Amino acid sequence: MLAGSVIAIGEALIDRLGPLGGDPSSDLPITDCFGGAPANVACALSRLGAKVSFIGSLGNDAFGEDFNNLLIQRGINTSGLQQDTLRPTRVVLVRRDSDGERCFEGFEGDKGLGFADQAISLEQIIRDWPLVAENAQWLVAGTIPLASEISSKAFLWCIENAMHSGIKIALDLNWRPTFWRNQVSTVSEPSVKEKNQILSILKNVSLIKLAKEEAQWFFHSSDPTELSSSLPQRQSVVVTDGSNPILWRLNNHLGKSFAIIPSSVVDTTGAGDAFTAGLIYKLISVELDQISEQSAKDIIQFGIACGSHVCKGVGAIEPQPYLDDIDNLLSLSKGGIS
């Protein structure tokens, strides 16, 4: 197990998957899977062998109890995991097309007060922070906590305290309009207010990962050099694009890495989160500002292998790889890097 540790903060929820090509709110069979980007990353890191703490909130319900048990079984430090007695664990309706690609259709379970992940308590985080931050090297975060007033305060406190404690921050700029607007929206692009709220935290991060579409919406470019140049500290940037090549800039090294396409794609729900976990796992043992060009290529390719492996199973967490799985996949893969 690696000596350093990672903190993941944000949503833990249930992905309700409908049948391929079907409606998860009405068509059978449905499959309920543990999910939420930060929770996915935490579980993937732990399975690879990293020490991980998770900060989030689950409902006082069967889903919350089962998710808590899963995190404990994975060996994740749950000192920062809160239980909300007023709000349920969020259930996300995920529609998948015939190729396994997914989109979010809305939520189930709200009783009028929202969901547990929208109400992460700052008071409890302040109390529990010493238990989760010890020996931490990285804080991994998404942007969904910014969408709710209560969780946003807790989230921003963690970002600030991590920065002042010398903990590097990796941000997955995962724009999901349904989470911000609490309904299925026909307008995918973020509003000026939503965009500014997310961009305001970028000055504190060391690594930003985002999809090509998100890069275009927030920066009007998917070129990692242009993105990095527009950031306050010219941070490292990784731009994903589904099964298309990944463009990246790590420690001033530029590259384009090609996907490892699994023979059978069942579900892509957790591929991006497994990719993120792979990057952070490799970065625990090396300083970001000291990596060589070859190390940068290897780090990206390791993440790609993690993402590819997850696509072979249902859900974001259950199919996550062990370290041996990735070593074997990389030894067999002919995925190229340029």
What are the language-model segments listed below?
Residues 12, 37, 144, 173, ...:
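Active-site metal-binding loops of divalent metal-dependent hydrolases
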Residues 1-7, 160-164, 222-338:
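Conserved phosphate-binding/catalytic region of the ribokinase-like
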